[in-house]
Curated annotation (Swiss-Prot):
Predominant cellular place of this UniProt entry's protein: cytoplasm
Keywords, ordered alphabetically: Cytoplasm, Ribonucleoprotein, Ribosomal protein
Name of this chain's protein: Small ribosomal subunit protein uS2
Recorded family membership: Belongs to the universal ribosomal protein uS2 family.
Subunit structure comment from the entry: Component of the small ribosomal subunit. Mature ribosomes consist of a small (40S) and a large (60S) subunit. The 40S subunit contains about 33 different proteins and 1 molecule of RNA (18S). The 60S subunit contains about 49 different proteins and 3 molecules of RNA (25S, 5.8S and 5S). Interacts with rps21.
Subcellular location: Cytoplasm
Pfam family, one: Ribosomal_S2
HAMAP family xref list: Ribosomal_S2_euk
Gene that this polypeptide is encoded by: rps0
Disordered: annotated segments: 278-300
Record's GO cellular component terms: cytosolic small ribosomal subunit
NCBIfam families named in the record: uS2_euk_arch
InterPro entries xrefs: Ribosomal_uS2, Ribosomal_uS2_C, Ribosomal_uS2_CS, Ribosomal_uS2_euk, Ribosomal_uS2_euk/arc, Ribosomal_uS2_flav_dom_sf
Lineage, broadest ranks: Eukaryota, Fungi, Dikarya, Ascomycota, Pezizomycotina
Length: 300
């Protein structure tokens, strides 16, 4: 990492550098835009451009000082059309008081005053200059300064402050937004001093796949579900499935008093007669005579 040009109070800690490296904020694209060359550290043999983490931290501090200079936090507009940054900008807006636009940027938000979504921000922060090109273009029409998270191949036209970082990874995007929010709160005095840890975890700024979360929740419900609860009802679940469901052999026609007797009813005399017969009755004789009677009345 190159020597820092910041005052000693703004120097990053060892933990900050390790977090930036763990989130792969230093891994850029294989293509390199000419205006991003000052932020290049080296190029790996496989062609991947490695960004300078020291420059990334310097630009995070510079962007935070610009944000703090805005009197009304609501005049700051944070934008992310990339899905990996939508959760991050919403969390950043909730912690700093900025206005978030997560998702598609409606053309005319900054230039067409007739639309209901018309805004006049004093500062615009975007996640990716390529996907948020419409917002940057409209900001240039109305002279709004722009701060952007720029990769090695990101276009920097009409970008006033470029934060060199990996703006395609979900962890890299979330971590940079988290560090930017923490630095803003430090400069505003919300955090007592720079040694005070922020109680908000970086995981809150990371992207979460809704389908993966839904599948995880459904898998947990299926594991906690008792087998057969939907088929037999809650009564059988309460009994613990202790009843005998299948009966075969000579006892197929027997009906025990323990399973059939209701509370307060005396069925003992009847049960002894039912079980007294040694021969298993099939029941075909009794039903056959009754079923044959309607056959004689087919003539009208």
């Amino acid at each position: 990492m190159a020597p820092s040009n910041l005052p000693a109070i703004f120097n990053p800690t060892q933990q900050d550098i390790e977090m930036l490296l763990a989130a792969q904020c230093h891994l850029g694209a294989k293509n390199l835009q000419v205006h991003m060359e000052p932020y290049l550290w080296k190029t790996r043999p496989d062609g991947v451009n490695v960004l300078n983490i020291g420059k990334t931290w310097e630009k995070i501090v510079l962007a935070a000082r610009i944000i703090v200079a805005i009197d009304n936090p609501a005049d700051i507009c944070v934008i992310s059309a990339r899905p990996y940054g939508q959760r991050a900008v919403l969390k950043f807006a909730s912690h700093t008081g900025a206005t978030a636009i997560a998702g598609r940027f409606t053309p005319g938000n900054f230039t067409n005053y007739i639309t209901r979504s018309f805004r006049e921000p004093r500062l615009v922060i975007v996640t990716d200059p390529r996907t948020d090109a419409q917002a940057i273009k409209e900001a240039s029409y109305v002279n709004i300064p722009v701060i952007a998270l720029c990769d090695g191949d990101s276009p920097t036209e009409y970008v006033d402050v470029a934060i060199p970082t990996n703006n395609k990874g979900r962890h890299a995007i979330g971590l940079v937004w988290w560090m930017l929010a923490r630095e803003v709160l430090r400069l505003r005095g919300t955090l007592a001093n720079r040694e005070t840890e922020w109680d908000v975890m970086t995981d809150l700024y990371f992207y979460r796949d809704p389908e993966a979360e839904e599948n995880k929740d459904s898998a947990g419900v299926e594991e906690a579900k008792v087998p057969g609860a939907d088929e037999v009802g809650p009564a059988a679940v309460a009994d613990g499935f202790t009843s005998e469901w299948e009966v075969s052999g000579a006892s197929a026609g027997a009906f025990t008093a323990q399973a059939a007797a209701a509370p307060g009813a005396s069925w003992d005399a009847d049960t002894t007669d039912w079980a007294a017969s040694g021969e298993a009755q099939t029941g075909n004789e009794g039903w056959g005579t009754e079923a044959a009677a309607p056959a004689a009345t087919t003539q009208w």
